[in-house]
From Swiss-Prot:
<dbReference type="InterPro" id="IPR014719">
    <property type="entry name" value="Ribosomal_bL12_C/ClpS-like"/>
</dbReference>
<dbReference type="InterPro" id="IPR036235">
    <property type="entry name" value="Ribosomal_bL12_oligo_N_sf"/>
</dbReference>
<dbReference type="InterPro" id="IPR013823">
    <property type="entry name" value="Ribosomal_bL12_C"/>
</dbReference>
<dbReference type="Pfam" id="PF16320">
    <property type="entry name" value="Ribosomal_L12_N"/>
</dbReference>
<protein>
    <recommendedName>
        <fullName>Large ribosomal subunit protein bL12</fullName>
    </recommendedName>
</protein>
<dbReference type="Pfam" id="PF00542">
    <property type="entry name" value="Ribosomal_L12"/>
</dbReference>
<comment type="subunit">
    <text>Homodimer. Part of the ribosomal stalk of the 50S ribosomal subunit. Forms a multimeric L10(L12)X complex, where L10 forms an elongated spine to which 2 to 4 L12 dimers bind in a sequential fashion. Binds GTP-bound translation factors.</text>
</comment>
<comment type="similarity">
    <text>Belongs to the bacterial ribosomal protein bL12 family.</text>
</comment>
<dbReference type="GO" id="GO:0003735">
    <property type="term" value="F:structural constituent of ribosome"/>
</dbReference>
<dbReference type="InterPro" id="IPR000206">
    <property type="entry name" value="Ribosomal_bL12"/>
</dbReference>
<dbReference type="GO" id="GO:0022625">
    <property type="term" value="C:cytosolic large ribosomal subunit"/>
</dbReference>
<dbReference type="GO" id="GO:0003729">
    <property type="term" value="F:mRNA binding"/>
</dbReference>
<keyword id="KW-0689">Ribosomal protein</keyword>
<keyword id="KW-0687">Ribonucleoprotein</keyword>
<dbReference type="InterPro" id="IPR008932">
    <property type="entry name" value="Ribosomal_bL12_oligo"/>
</dbReference>
<dbReference type="GO" id="GO:0006412">
    <property type="term" value="P:translation"/>
</dbReference>
<comment type="function">
    <text>Forms part of the ribosomal stalk which helps the ribosome interact with GTP-bound translation factors. Is thus essential for accurate translation.</text>
</comment>
């Protein structure tokens, strides 16, 4: 069988009905022993299992928002750190620092969030992780 290009495969899929595509996906999953389920659905399914227990959910949290609560006395140093942590320009970083409390990083990995918090606090800022 000749190898099909991505465009040829997409053209073939465009001609199929939803039922035919659904059957194709099932057969593909069985043949290659994979799942086409979105990883988000797995994470969302795990959330209700935690129930009302907030403490264990916080321990397992792997994404954090770094919130700048205040710049403190060394505003220029904090602006420099914000620019170093983000891709913001000087004006945008200054506006962010002056309008605190504001998120500096969103959905950052735990290690990155902690490093950012330490750097901002070393520059004189007050920071929280959420």
């Amino acid at each position: 069988m000749a190898k099909l290009s991505n465009e040829e495969l997409l053209d073939a899929f465009k001609e199929m009905t939803l039922i035919e595509l659904s059957e194709f996906v099932k057969q593909f999953e069985e043949t290659f022993d994979v799942s086409a389920a979105a990883p988000v659905a797995v994470a969302a399914a795990g959330a209700p299992a935690a129930g009302g227990e907030a403490a264990p959910a916080e321990e397992e949290k792997d994404e954090f928002d770094v919130i700048l609560e205040s710049a403190g006395d060394k505003k220029i140093q904090v602006i420099k750190e914000v620019r170093g942590l983000t891709s913001l320009g000087l004006k945008d970083a200054k506006d962010l620092v002056e309008s605190a409390p504001k998120p500096v990083l969103e959905k950052a990995k735990k290690e990155d969030a902690e490093k950012a918090k330490e750097a901002l606090e070393a520059a004189g800022a007050t920071v929280t992780l959420k």
